[in-house]
Amino acid sequence: MTQHLDICIRGGGIVGHTLALLLARDRLRIGLVAPPPQSSSEPDVRAYALNAKSKALLESVRCWPDAMHATEVTAMQVKGDDGGEVNFSAASLAVPALTWIVDVPALEAQLRDAVRFQSHIELLDAPRPATLTVVCEGRLSATREEFGVDFTATRYPQHAIAARLSCEKPHAQVARQWFKGDDILAFLPLDGPLGQSVGMVWSAPDARTPELLEMDAQDFCEQVEELSEGCLGKLALISPRKAWALQSAQASRWIGVANGQSWALAGDAAHNVHPLAGQGLNLGLSDVAELADILHTRAYWRPVNDVKLLRRYERARRAEVTATDMAMTGLQQLFARQGSGWQKLRNWGMQGFELSGITKHWAARQAMGL
């Protein structure tokens, strides 16, 4: 006879696996719908910036990668298009690192291994009835649509182009970002403290994206070198280029009941934000940390689908996600505006922020999840 599940998690990515491991500690019966990973001959370009809060969460389930696959960022440089510049350093904030750039395949492999050794987690090929279903399927979630949840999306006029680059010079554990007109370019240091490769994310105008994807590798790297002011010397592509449309989006409801089935959304199934500050996965991990904590501390007589508990989760997470999304959209629109007046205003603002002391310190610690 099939055992009844307390919680069925639909979605086998980082967010879904982490939630399963957190809930299993409370001896709940968990089903995880997670198809086996598909093998590919192409290198995986994905890397995420994870803050101290996310690091602590993953360490709590013993799934933090080693130093070669979770590169400490000890400094950040952000440059505007007219001399504005903001710098952060771990030393000035008295922390070991500002953030960590995590290799996604390495993290996913550790999470899969941890789940396999958990007796309270059952890997499923298809969803099963459960007291609560948590949807972690990403922004194209079919289950969210099945449950009749509106997902209001606003497209930015940009695509993100991601790739991995080898560099002539070591990255020195510095994350770098440039705002130049319609372009936002970020370099994320990889392969440990002495690494000479970076994860590149280039938010480029929609109209230019096809050209940049089809461009000869050498010509593409020359454009990246120019945009990055040659800071790491000669660059070479070491992965394919991948691209996706950028959008701001949030589900109209994060919890509910459909066809007698209680459900909650988490991660990109609930929200999307612009990647310019690298907060996407941090928000998703904060979702599952909040949900797991609420279920862990519930009164013994409350079921896991208690609507008061789920509403508490929705209120808490919607507030943070909305604030982050507004900040990211505001920054994107500020730097997208053309004209010398706007250019001077935003770069003056960057210089003021650089000299602001307490405000800059507070903003840095917020981004770090401290």
Show where each model-derived region lies.
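Glycine-rich FAD cofactor-binding loop and adjacent beta-loop-alpha segment at the N-terminus
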Residues: 4-8, 12-74
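Active-site flanking residues adjacent to catalytic metal/cofactor-binding acidic residues
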Residues: 10, 33, 136, 267, ...
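Conserved FAD-binding catalytic core of PHBH/FMO-like flavoproteins
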Residues: 58, 133-243
